[in-house]
């Protein structure tokens, strides 16, 4: 007969259920469970004396008849589409079901069959998110990949060839030779990868060559000359070959102003990097481009969020990254023109309004590759404290704000770069790139990272201990990151033209390669929970930013969550 237990006891046993609320780490963000797929009384849980045992919660069903490879039990899913409690079934490295796991012969409502061939991961009391996507990577050193993975990022898009001077400044992998070498290097790296070719050319031939060689996109960067002619040529090739174009515009306004760049774009889809401008772009008003319907605007994390240290650290970072000389007054003036407290403050608010849609790192080129998710939720916290609840949220929770911010580092970069059919959300059919977080460490330290259905990273104790938990406990790579397990668990994204040219075979690639698609039809309206189109203007004298006539300003944060409380530095 049924046995009633208290809500607290239930949460401690099976994790929170509908109506329960959770604080995200040490932030002011409160999450509330919207739905629970569990059938009360028929929950599954692994362990001695628990449910997933032969003839109880485990059926006799073999894998060949539909039992899943892995079940994540009682996880609290946080995604752009909802905050729900569910079991998640994985097969062949993909998500096959979100619902109720167990044995259909003994339990009600089973949609995920647990069999003798099923592994169990306990999701009770933990938050499950899609693996993060960082779409602004300078591939300066391979050690970035481990650092990103340790933060919950499982997909990295960008450009570079290592610590070359060009790569230190620009996210471009220029030319067929370098693209080929980077695609080969990707074979040993346990994340999904894609590389941008250099988009700075006024004629199409060299751009087409790079796309055919395997570039999944093209990057226009001012350090290579982002002129109206280059913008037009690059976008024309992108439209023809279905790849995304990313742009870092002309800070010095040498070849034109922001209005000239908008005119050169001609209404075509484009991903604007560090759209506020401290990372580069038309001074002082590149930020206004976020109001264009064809523009997919992103930030990089050096300015996320605006704090009392933001301005001070930027000048030195900028001088190093862009190969500037502090002894040359013009170089110093160039750097100083990009750093404006008014536009950085406005950037916080534009993110909170959903007018800026994506957050990425700018790894080792002013940004920190291991802090994308951390900085995203620090921004959300700061805005909750300074602006209060969003109109869409209730007095009980911050669900809409939390979903808006998780979308910035998951589904929206996936949509922008034509990879959303494989990654970016927890939905059936997608690659099982998943991150489990203890709520007290959400956004700062994942408990477990799953890549293509295999565990690639986890918090792990002393390997010589008698159990897995004795200290020192820290993140370490797991079996999924080694040997031939790596290739089938990871994707390399190429252009369709490169796939047609059989580039994977020509380069001897063993990883699964996928063509990006539908990059030219995506507009800002397609970006989840971040599609606002305010009319933005900047006062050229004071740099004050206005959206639909309203001044956007906020104070710098003095103290942040997800910081020194968690990091012994």
Curated annotation (Swiss-Prot):
Classification via PROSITE patterns: UREASE_1, UREASE_2, UREASE_3
Stored Gene3D superfamilies: Metal-dependent hydrolases (3.20.20.140), Urease, subunit C, domain 1 (2.30.40.10)
UniProt binding sites for substrate: 221
Main subcellular localisation: cytoplasm
One Gene Ontology biological process: urea catabolic process
Post-translational modification: Carboxylation allows a single lysine to coordinate two nickel ions.
NCBIfam families: PRK13206.1, PRK13207.1, urease_alph
Entry protein name: Urease subunit alpha
Cellular component annotations (GO), alphabetically ordered: cytoplasm
Subcellular location: Cytoplasm
Family to which the UniProt record says this protein belongs: Belongs to the metallo-dependent hydrolases superfamily. Urease alpha subunit family.
Keyword terms: Cytoplasm, Hydrolase, Metal-binding, Nickel
UniProt cofactor note: Binds 2 nickel ions per subunit.
Active site, UniProt feature: 322 (proton donor)
HAMAP family named among the record's database cross-references: Urease_alpha
Pathway: Nitrogen metabolism; urea degradation; CO(2) and NH(3) from urea (urease route): step 1/1
Residues bound to Ni(2+) 2: 219, 248, 274
Cofactors required: Ni cation
Residues the entry annotates as binding Ni(2+) 1: 136, 138, 219, 362
Keyword Cytoplasm: yes
Modified residues (N6-carboxylysine): 219
Subunit organization: Heterotrimer of UreA (gamma), UreB (beta) and UreC (alpha) subunits. Three heterotrimers associate to form the active enzyme.
InterPro entries noted in UniProt: Amidohydro-rel, Metal-dep_hydrolase_composite, Metal_Hydrolase, Urease_alpha_N_dom, Urease_alpha_subunit, Urease_AS, Urease_asu, Urease_asu_c
Catalytic activity: urea + 2 H2O + H(+) = hydrogencarbonate + 2 NH4(+)
Organism: Synechococcus sp. (strain CC9902)
GO molecular function: nickel cation binding; urease activity
